[in-house]
Amino acid sequence: MSKQVFETIFAGKKLAVEIGQVAKQANGAALVRYGDSTVLSAAVMSKKMSTGDFFPLQINYEEKRYAAGKFPGGFNKREGRPSTDATLTARLIDRPIRPMFAEGFRNEVQVINTVLSYDADASAPMAAMFGSSLALSISDIPFNGPIAGVQVAYLDGQYVINPTAEEKKASLLELTVAGTKEAINMVESGAKELSEDIMLEALLKGHEAVRELIAFQEEIIAAVGKEKAEVELLQVDADLQAEIVGKYNADLQKAVQIEEKKAREIATEAVKEHVTAEYEERYAEHEEHDRIMRDVAEILEQMEHAEVRRLITEDKVRPDGRRVDEIRPLDAEIDFLPKVHGSGLFTRGQTQALSVLTLAPMGDTQIVDGLDEEYKKRFMHHYNFPQYSVGETGRYGAPGRREIGHGALGERALAQVLPSLEAFPYAIRLVAEVLESNGSSSQASICAGTLALMAGGVPIKAPVAGIAMGLISDGTNYTVLTDIQGLEDHFGDMDFKVAGTREGITALQMDIKIEGITPQILEEALAQAKKARFEILDVIEKVIPAPRLELAPTAPKIDTIKVDVDKIKIVIGKGGETIDKIIEETGVKIDIDEDGNIAIYSSDQEAINRTKEIIASLVREAKVGEIYEAEVVRIEKFGAFVHLFDKTDALVHISEIAWTRTNKVEDVLAVGDKVTVKVVKVDDKGRIDASMKALLPRPPRSEKSNKEDHQSVRHHGSPKDDKGKEKYDK
């Protein structure tokens, strides 16, 4: 295929797609140029069905440092494992694409998005999502797209599609919405306590823009799209299915209807093991043994799936007996751990999260160096999900994509209510340890995080709570579920997480397994989530109604002092000599920013106070009118130099020693004398003139003495004064 170029204008920027020039051996590839961002999306598919019981889709988003004109850090000077932002972007693209493959599709599919050039004002992640959908759509891979995604900002009462970097900073909303032409199928958002109405309108505005991008994709697909390949889908034997359903459906239904999770799991597993053993024995020598046993497992899964959905849609009963809008029993506790800076334990049914707060000096902030300009990240929320939380064994090691994603969701939800850096100059880390899980563990971590922050004395604007909403839909009728548990998440159609305060929403995340949901469902889910959120906040506020006024005794105390920008170098000293000496003497930690804000951290308040005194004396400036107890340090013919404080001296001119004429300075003063002086002048070079006589009562004057004084002033006037100043400079 020869190179073909397709162009349009989207959200005020040129969007160009090039097909047929690069990555021609992939099943499908698209080079997307949006503004000055360039992303190559390439899709490939395995030739055979995989043997696993899931769809092996892998979406990668690769940030090349050269794309932003940056050199890789580290010893190897080469890109390594994906950054957290790259991992989150890959998840963002995966989520709207995954539901668009047929049920039973098991061929491995891989989509690689490589950022080749980066423009902060033209969203590379959205270009990658567009390119991923297009690469799959024009290929022979049986993808039921296209899909597209956009970012939405909200500022000055207006919605902005794919905002610039500056618009994002000013926005009250950071929303990514994706979907098909017909419906929304993925949402990810952080917001500054916005109402449900504003959020819903943002979703609808975003979907309008999504449809515009899909229309552009359809134009390209019509021109260059390949015929879709015929692939084998995982389908069970109809006769075998009828036999197993007829014999064992009643037993499985009875097991599924047990309300307590562990007992239900044991009973359900017992039925499955009995059926599996029967067919294993019957077909042990059969030539299609493996296929038959795979079908048996799939049929049992489908039976359980059908019964859970039937209970909810027909009987209006959930597996644990709750109403559709009922939350599981709640419990909240603070100060669960000693010694730490703050802790909160939150339990919702059989889901439990422990959140632990740590405060640190701003020097411990995380440096984020991606394709954007390097910046310091003050707040971190980390989420850990050990396998024991669900009573299983499994991989134990570095966090995976799911844990990174859940941590980021909690971070967005809680970041909106944190105090400003000026009001609370600490680095803040929350770690959520999921101790039990039966659904909605990410939202439990948000609630536990709120408890830990308030217990630790972090002055958050308001407590935040989170809830997960679910959906069971048969295409015509639907039921929205509040506080979904694991079974409802696994067999349901939607996982819609909503976090916020009483004032509004701070975070959203939606994943679905069907092709999309309507605005009506979104509106109903948001309203139901608000009611549930308020119930949870009632429980949290009964335990701790407001943040504590003091930090934990183990937390580092902090005080601040501000110096002029041109004084920063004095505090730091040559090669850091001065600040190192202060730290060694007092044992504190010190952070200085470029605006002259100095934060001093220590568990010892006396050490903080001593440090403030030292810094204040280093940057202290004499001001006209101030009075000092000074010491004479040098005698000259034209006056005496006196030491005011630290490295600051002043000149007391011979004419400023007394009201009567002084013939010789040595007649009145000697080195080491203690004198009281008043600052009378500070010139633009920082040279200080002081006076002793200004603090003495002025004697009455005769006409003769007035003439003598006038002559004395003239005698000590400009020439000698200037000469004296030259010596002073030296």
Swiss-Prot record:
Subcellular location: Cytoplasm
GO cellular component: cytosol
GO biological process: mRNA catabolic process; RNA processing
Name of the protein in its database record: Polyribonucleotide nucleotidyltransferase
Gene: pnp
Main localization (coarse): cytoplasm
Cofactor(s) annotated in UniProt: Mg(2+)
EC number in record: 2.7.7.8
GO molecular-function term, one example from the UniProt record: RNA binding
Domain (S1 motif): residue spans on this chain: 625-693
Family from the record: Belongs to the polyribonucleotide nucleotidyltransferase family.
Natural source organism: Streptococcus mutans serotype c (strain ATCC 700610 / UA159)
Keywords in alphabetical order: Cytoplasm, Magnesium, Metal-binding, Nucleotidyltransferase, RNA-binding, Transferase
